[in-house]
Amino acid sequence: MTFTREANRFLADMRRLLRVRSYSKRTLDTYVRWAQRFLESHSSTPVDRLTRDHVEEFLAVLTTQGRLAPKSRNQATSALAFFFREALGRDELYAMPRAKESRRVPSVLSHRQVRLVLGQLSGKYRLLGSLMYGAGLRLTEAHQLRVKDIDFDLLQITVRDGKGAKDRWVMLPELLVPALRRQVARVAEQNQDDRRSGGGWAALPNALARKAPTAGYELAWQFVFPASRSSKDPATGKRGRYHLHASSTQRQVKKAASASGIPKPVTCHTFRRSFATQMLRAGYDARSVQKLMGHSDIRTTMTYVQAITDAGIGMRSPLDRRHNQD
């Protein structure tokens, strides 16, 4: 849809303010998309005359049409609260009630099931799946890894700007070292070829882009899993490679899960959940797993403990014990 000049100005302000406040690109795009949908639904009303009533009507329509789950509704509420507060300078969405999100038992895989799914993946996608399971990475964290974040000597990965803009360290599975070294070597060769043809740039964090404007050409800052095609960085106009798009990995994992024959839903996030479950079952305490997972709240980690307890994972049925004794 084509927005009015006024609406476009407010949307541009929203983008700028999200960047200034160091929101991730993913959150920025999501928030702006919700603001666009809201403005589109009330296109006949001038932006400066929109109120909380318009927001509640927008959310109610989407909810009654069955197109808005509680989690998405809360996301939309946060996005529109930011739009009103920061772009419009009005805080009338303060303390707007949130939808109650249902708590589901997380779907996890056994080690054998993980191997079945990984066995259906190949190349960089198998390596990505192995990192999500072996180090507990989120899909976005695995995609955003840069060459400098991998320490082969210490067997350590630095996760930069994870969820909540927090850095953390996770284990690098020794089993993945050879494959990761080969991937980095391919990235180095590709970067040299790109630089010879006028490319080779990797988008930098805002602060570094100002302090070291040429660092984006260095191998250390290249993405470990770059996109197959180069493009222009919208912030600098320089040609280079961004990281893989999430949809490409999600598509490959979905196909692999289907081919493996596992009768349960499997997504990229299932690898990470399975990591947490396996670590807890192995006897690691919840606080240690919380740090590895990058959970800001221990209660998030405890959902995995609860899932293990509720499902009786690791316990033995009295029928099995009796059978073994006999």
For the regions a language model picked out, list residue spans one by one.
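Conserved catalytic core of the tyrosine transesterase superfamily
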Residues: 1-326
